């Protein structure tokens, strides 16, 4: 598997597999394989999270993760704390031109 690392931080990395033509987002103990279209959609989902809204919602959970991201799998929601969300943004908020550099 020939992976080009696009971005990396303490929580994970975003890479591109030339062999399979997919982006690989590893984040803590999560691996998500995304097509170009799926990465663009995920980018928009992450970008549009209303941080102020979710910060003000009382969280009675023992794990203090306030920021949910719904997935297409009905019974799976990814949850992040503020620092994890910022790290996730750092990985997936790449420009259109940078993304296209890898797929062309």
Regions found by a protein language model. Give the residues of each.
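Positively charged, low-complexity terminal tracts
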Residues: 1-104
């Amino acid at each position: 598997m020939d992976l080009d690392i696009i971005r990396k931080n303490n929580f994970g990395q975003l890479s591109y597999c030339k062999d399979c033509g997919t982006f690989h987002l590893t984040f803590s103990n999560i691996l998500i394989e995304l097509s170009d279209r799926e990465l663009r959609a995920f980018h928009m989902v992450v970008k549009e999270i209303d941080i102020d809204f979710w910060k003000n919602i009382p969280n009675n959970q023992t794990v203090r993760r306030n920021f949910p991201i719904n997935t297409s799998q009905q019974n799976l929601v990814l949850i992040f704390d503020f620092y994890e969300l910022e790290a996730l943004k750092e990985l997936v908020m790449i420009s259109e031109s940078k993304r296209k550099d890898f797929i062309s």
